């Protein structure tokens, strides 16, 4: 094991000089002898000097301190022992519940599965959220992105998906909190504990207040745990179906930007790192399904200034099977979840996958809403009276559809006071089909707001009259 000395410290970036014949490799973990701080090698500068990023606070470091090369990348504990536990980027438990009971560990840098090992699937994953199941259905083993600006409900939507999928799903889940609020991590832990599924979830947190090195690598730590669960074979030689939640992918990119600037790289568009696409690809290519098991990932993606063309969300789009776009305009109407039914898409929206009825209803809903969107300008200038009878009917149905796309969430029950609803896919299709066919033209549009199934809307209408 070679030893070196610190020669320069610039914030989270530390330069270490090693003997020339014992230089560490890129991504090797270095350990500070004095306080056990871990550094990760990012660049070889020549003359025996390596540039590393600190996986913790660099306060108190000084030149001349001794650093040891571990000879391997950062390794984290994996396996059943991590379930129900909260760990940090280095796999160290932070929940004050003692050491992790596992003898297995894995390096956080792994190669993505080869092309011939991959497996594609068209099996649908029911979420119980009407707008998602109808218009942007999720595939088992697929990748889903929740896109939205600040405060439109990405985390609440993700928590509801965890609530509906992870609780019903008999498999294991991994939650990676990347650069988000500590409060949200705490809420998630208690949510899982109260619903008795904590023993099926491994949690990896690197909050907003952590140094950029932690936030950059915490997604890889969570992914490494998920990969292990996917690849671990049972007695029948099969792997597992794992759920992998990431909140928030944008913070991963942002940490990469901070690290890139500290390493002295020239910034590219909008100040992002020049290696943005490669870093994103390296993470996303590993989140995939193989012949043995699957990883279904749901990722929240913050959209800076609500601009979907920003390089960070734009780079993420390319890797996803389904995109759920949350809109501030829809949130301002009081419709939650604030999913934009026209912007959100899914590769599964295909009659060969969904069946003809589901496909026709979904396209019918979208075309009605699109027509309403086009008519809104005319209504704003001339009023409803200037529309033809056919257009008036379209607008009336579109407004009912818009309200019926809202739904009370289980996780928001404490704020709203109305109990959460899980709506089965067949009820969702039947409800929207009936509205499109005009079966509920006689009901007031308010009856469709914040209900579960169409039967509830009918009951609500009775109380409104």
UniProtKB/Swiss-Prot annotation:
- What Gene Ontology cellular-component terms does the record carry? plasma membrane; proton-transporting ATP synthase complex
Q: What is its main location?
A: membrane
GO MF annotation list = ATP binding; ATP hydrolysis activity; proton-transporting ATP synthase activity, rotational mechanism
Family from the record: Belongs to the ATPase alpha/beta chains family.
Location in or out of the cell: Cell inner membrane
Q: Which organism is it from?
A: Neisseria meningitidis serogroup B (strain ATCC BAA-335 / MC58)
Q: Provide the top EC class.
A: translocase
UniProt function note: Produces ATP from ADP in the presence of a proton gradient across the membrane. The catalytic sites are hosted primarily by the beta subunits.
Provide the residue positions that the database annotates as binding ATP: 148-155
UniProt keyword annotation of NADP present:
no
Catalytic activity reads: ATP + H2O + 4 H(+)(in) = ADP + phosphate + 5 H(+)(out)
Q: What EC number is given for this enzyme?
A: 7.1.2.2
Keyword flag Amino-acid biosynthesis: no
**Entry superkingdom:** Bacteria
Self-association and partners: F-type ATPases have 2 components, CF(1) - the catalytic core - and CF(0) - the membrane proton channel. CF(1) has five subunits: alpha(3), beta(3), gamma(1), delta(1), epsilon(1). CF(0) has three main subunits: a(1), b(2) and c(9-12). The alpha and beta chains form an alternating ring which encloses part of the gamma chain. CF(1) is attached to CF(0) by a central stalk formed by the gamma and epsilon chains, while a peripheral stalk is formed by the delta and b chains.
**Record-annotated membrane-spanning stretches:** none
Its topology with respect to the membrane? Peripheral membrane protein
- What protein name applies here? ATP synthase subunit beta
Q: Kindly give the Pfam families that the UniProt entry links to this protein.
A: ATP-synt_ab, ATP-synt_ab_N, ATP-synt_VA_C
PANTHER family per record:
ATP SYNTHASE (PTHR15184), ATP SYNTHASE SUBUNIT BETA, MITOCHONDRIAL (PTHR15184:SF71)
């Amino acid at each position: 094991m070679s030893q070196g000395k610190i020669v320069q410290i610039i914030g989270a970036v530390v330069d270490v000089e090693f003997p020339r014949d014992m230089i560490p490799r890129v991504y090797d973990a270095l350990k500070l002898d004095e306080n056990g701080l871990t550094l990760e090698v990012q660049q070889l500068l020549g003359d025996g000097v390596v540039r590393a990023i600190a996986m913790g606070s660099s306060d108190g470091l000084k030149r001349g301190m001794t650093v040891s090369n571990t000879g391997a990348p950062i390794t984290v504990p994996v396996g059943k022992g991590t379930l129900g536990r909260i760990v940090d980027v280095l796999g160290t438990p932070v929940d004050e519940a003692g050491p992790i009971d596992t003898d297995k560990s894995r390096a956080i840098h792994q190669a993505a599965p080869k092309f011939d090992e991959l497996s594609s699937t068209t099996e649908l994953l029911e979420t119980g959220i009407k707008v998602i199941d109808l218009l942007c259905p999720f595939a088992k083993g697929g990748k889903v992105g929740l896109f939205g600006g600040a405060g439109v409900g990405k985390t609440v939507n993700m928590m509801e998906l965890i609530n509906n999928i992870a609780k019903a799903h008999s498999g294991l889940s991994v939650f990676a909190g990347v650069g988000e609020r500590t409060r949200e991590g705490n809420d998630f832990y208690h949510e899982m504990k109260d619903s008795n599924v904590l023993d099926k979830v491994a949690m990896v947190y690197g909050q907003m207040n952590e140094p950029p090195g932690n936030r950059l690598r915490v997604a890889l730590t969570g992914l490494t745990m998920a990969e292990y669960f996917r690849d671990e074979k049972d007695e029948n030689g099969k792997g597992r179906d794992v759920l992998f939640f990431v909140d928030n992918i944008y913070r991963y990119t942002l940490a990469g930007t901070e690290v890139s600037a500290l390493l002295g790289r020239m910034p590219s568009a909008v100040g992002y790192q020049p290696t943005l696409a490669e870093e994103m690809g390296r993470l996303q290519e590993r989140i995939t399904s193989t012949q043995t098991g699957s990883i279904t990932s749901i990722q929240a993606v913050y959209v800076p200034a609500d601009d979907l063309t920003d390089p960070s969300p734009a780079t993420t789009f390319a890797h996803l099977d389904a995109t759920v776009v949350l809109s501030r305009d829809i949130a301002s109407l009081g419709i939650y979840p604030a999913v934009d039914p026209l912007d959100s898409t899914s590769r599964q929206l295909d009659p060969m996958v969904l069946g003809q009825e589901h496909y026709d209803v979904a396209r019918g809903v979208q075309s009605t809403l699109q027509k309403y969107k086009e008519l809104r300008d005319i209504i704003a200038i001339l009023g409803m009276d200037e529309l033809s009878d056919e257009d008036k009917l379209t607008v009336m149905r579109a407004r009912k559809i818009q309200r019926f796309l809202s739904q009370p969430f289980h996780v928001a029950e404490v704020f709203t006071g109305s109990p959460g609803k899980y709506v089965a896919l067949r009820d969702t299709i039947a409800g929207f089909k009936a509205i499109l066919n005009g079966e509920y033209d006689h009901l007031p549009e308010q009856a469709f707001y914040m209900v579960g199934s169409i039967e509830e809307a009918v009951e609500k209408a009775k109380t409104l009259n």
